[in-house]
A protein has these predicted regions:
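Helix-loop boundary and gating motifs at the non-cytosolic
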Residues: 2-58, 212, 216-263
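Hydrophobic alpha-helical transmembrane segments
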Residues: 15, 19, 50, 80, 102-113, 119, 138-194, 237, ...
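Substrate-agnostic recognition of the 12-TM MFS/MFS-like secondary transporter fold
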Residues: 16-32, 55-68, 74-86, 104-163, ...
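Membrane-interface helix-capping segments at transmembrane helix termini in multi-pass transporters
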Residues: 37-50, 91-114, 134, 138, ...
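C-terminal transmembrane bundle of multi-pass solute transporters/carriers
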Residues: 50-52, 61-66, 70-72, 76-85, ...
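Flexible cytoplasmic inter-helical loops of multi-pass small-molecule transporters
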Residues: 186-212, 398-402
Length: 402
């Protein structure tokens, strides 16, 4: 199981890129946590503090449009330029001093969110040419593990730095992380082909071309939809956490950190093992297995028994990355290079945009129904999608329209 991981780590491009992911991930997660605390301290408003997360999430809705840019330019150049621009943008929060300045923070976070959508699409396309195909499953799993690790440790760094030096220091740290990411992208060596020169249609028409490819593809569509359903189920499960602690476990809210850490540990393990499973299982079965583990974890969290709840959090973390990694790896494999930026961005929108809606729905549900109903709904969604993936079997080869 470790052979593929060691092979990936021996690949120079993979090592350089992973370094950039870890550094920028620390900066982004630290800044997101610090921004919420910063807005809360300046305004005293819980609603405005919550708006921080919305600003970072909202640009994912424009993914198909932003992904178009990743197909019009060289991806490595685009990644370097975008990272440098975001480094400059992230210096602006140093001017935030009063409640009247929080609009600047919201603007910066929205721009960074848009930049993240763009870089995610360009990275997916660049990796398809920079990392050998047989290593992409392991590589994408390592990236997911790196993201999960930074999302666990980055907020601790952000909270500590904010307490010691204030919000501007965290913003400057994030700016530095963008500079280091740009340096990592610059060090990637790949023979990237120039964008296809052809008569350009309208931006909307080219965007639709990417959406059409994904939606008509018999392999991509179900895997991407399954990834989106996994994130919806995750949103329903996570919003029940505090009700679970209060009503089910009778533990303080701070105990959520324990469950989050256990789930994060499971996600790291899930990412590290994804490549090995992809070599042994068809991708639709791996996605189905991940969703099944998630469903079992959600059911376990509904028992109200502490050891079982902890085990359930571990199962959720273990299973959730597999449908996401399976969808991403298949997008890279099944998409023509000149469409890859648009298709990758569209896939990310379909997978991650529903998360925000699920969080809103879950927040409303948890105030009106027993938290176990919410966990049962999350488990039901997971096992239903898993069954559909398993039953449909391996799809027929895709033949693009002529």
């Amino acid at each position: 199981m470790s052979v593929g991981l060691f092979t990936v780590l021996r690949d120079r491009n993979a090592r350089v890129y992973l370094t950039g992911v870890i550094v920028s991930g620390f900066g982004d997660s630290a800044m997101l946590l610090a921004s919420g605390v910063w807005v809360k301290e300046l305004t005293g408003s819980d609603g405005l503090a919550a708006l921080v997360g919305f600003c970072a999430w909202a640009p994912v809705l424009a993914g198909p449009l932003l992904g178009n840019l990743a197909d019009r330019t060289r991806r490595r150049t685009l990644l370097i330029a975008t990272s440098l621009v975001l480094a400059v943008v992230m210096t602006a929060p140093a001017a935030v001093r009063s409640p009247g300045d929080v609009w600047l923070l919201f603007t910066v976070l929205t721009l960074v969110g848009a930049g993240t959508v763009l870089t995610d699409a360009a990275e997916t396309a660049l990796i398809a040419s920079a990392v050998p195909g047989e290593l992409r499953g392991d590589f994408n799993g390592l990236v997911r593990s790196a993201v999960e690790s930074t999302s666990l440790l980055g907020p601790l760094l952000g909270a500590g730095l904010f307490t010691l030096l204030g919000g501007p220091a965290v913003a400057l740290l994030n700016a530095l992380s963008f500079l280091l990411a740009a340096a990592a992208f610059w060090r990637i060596r790949t023979r990237e082909t120039a964008p296809v020169r052809r008569p350009r249609g309208s931006w909307a028409a080219e965007t639709v071309e990417g959406v059409r490819h994904l939606w008509r593809h018999p392999t991509l569509r179900p895997l991407v939809v399954a990834g989106g359903c996994a994130m919806v189920a995750s949103g329903l499960s996570s919003t029940a956490t505090y009700a679970l602690l209060d009503t089910g476990l009778r533990r303080p809210a701070a105990f959520a950190g324990v469950l989050t850490s256990v789930q994060g540990l499971g996600s790291v393990v899930g990412g590290l093992t994804a490549g090995a499973f992809l070599r042994r299982l068809p991708v639709h079965l791996l996605s189905a297995l991940g969703l099944t583990l998630f469903a079992l974890g959600a059911l376990a969290r509904g028992t109200g028994l502490l050891p079982v709840v902890v085990l359930g959090s571990l199962l959720i973390g273990l299973g959730l990355p597999w449908p996401l990694i399976g969808a991403l790896t298949t997008v890279q494999k099944e998409t023509p290079e000149d469409l890859l930026g648009r298709v990758a961005a569209t896939a990310n929108t379909l997978v991650f945009a529903p998360t925000g809606l699920a969080l809103l729905a879950g927040t409303a549900l948890v105030t009106t129904v027993d938290y176990r109903v919410q966990l049962l709904a999350a488990a039901g969604l997971g096992v239903t999608v898993a069954a559909l993936l398993a039953v449909r079997g391996r799809p027929a080869p895709f033949r693009p329209p002529t």
